[in-house]
Amino acid sequence: MADKRFFGTKTFPNQEKALKAKIMNNDAFISWIEKNLGHRPKDPALFLRAMTHPSHGNSDYQRLEFLGDRVLGLVIANWLYDLFPREPEGKLSRRLNSLVSGASCASIARIVGLPQWLRLGKQARDDGAAASDNVLGDVMEAMIGAIFLESGIEAAGKLIHKYWAPLVTGQESAPKHPKSALQEWAAAHNRRPPVYEIVSRTGPQHNPCFTIQVSIAGVGEASAEGSSKQEAQTAAAQALLDILAQ
């Protein structure tokens, strides 16, 4: 179990009391955690907090997400280190970055049925936060953080190994980042480096949508959307690579 001298969360009595009152009688929520995440909550309010978006109130998932992100990274990094003993650091890093990405975490969140339990403010719900990869990825990491706090790295690792296994074993080779691949294509064909431009930014602050265009002079261009500039750039680079491969 995690040592709470180091990992304990700061709580506020009135908020904690309200959270516990709201969840203690919700057997369906507790049963869902036990069935899908393999963990019986000792403190249901901790897991309710992991499901609470900042738009809903003060006691939200952000601190738990911060912790869960590090736990996920450590477990995956150790897994890859053991699984691919001959791979250099660069290839391991590319595998890791793909496996802990927001899109990967969001895909797991959907598999376990997490969206139905999200606690969102009205505006966030109306804006589609329940379908946002950013939000779902963060909440999945927050749940990992909550399990770590209650039962330690072994319990969190068991969950991660169960749901990330298809992603880990599905990587036949270390994935090359689309932006790097496009850069290499341009260099190999004596072209100028790709240029990325922001076409637009729409949506609310908690669920933005960026449209990015990438172009290689004299070759072509492609556009794509993403919930962050980096995500949109990656998608645009992949779109242009797909065009070049035709």
From Swiss-Prot:
Q: Name the EC number(s).
A: 3.1.26.3
Q: Cofactors per UniProt?
A: Mg(2+)
> What InterPro entries does UniProt report for this protein, alphabetically?
dsRBD_dom (IPR014720), RNase_III (IPR011907), RNase_III_dom (IPR000999), RNase_III_sf (IPR036389)
Q: Which domain of life is it from?
A: Bacteria
Where does it live in the cell? Answer: Cytoplasm
Q: What class of enzyme is it?
A: hydrolase
Q: Which residues bind Mg(2+)?
A: 65, 138, 141
CC terms in the record's Gene Ontology section = cytoplasm
Keyword list (alphabetical) reads: Cytoplasm, Endonuclease, Hydrolase, Magnesium, Metal-binding, mRNA processing, Nuclease, RNA-binding, rRNA processing, rRNA-binding, tRNA processing
Residue intervals of the DRBM domain: 177-246
Q: Name one Pfam family in it.
A: dsrm
Q: Does the keyword Phosphoprotein apply?
A: no
Q: Which Gene3D superfamilies match?
A: 3.30.160.20, Ribonuclease III domain
The record's principal subcellular location, in a coarse class, is: cytoplasm
Q: State the oligomer form and interacting partners.
A: Homodimer.
Against PANTHER family, the record matches this protein to: RIBONUCLEASE 3 (PTHR11207:SF0), RIBONUCLEASE III (PTHR11207)
Q: What is this protein called?
A: Ribonuclease 3
Name the source organism. Answer: Zymomonas mobilis subsp. mobilis (strain ATCC 31821 / ZM4 / CP4)
In the UniProt record, the gene name given for this protein reads rnc
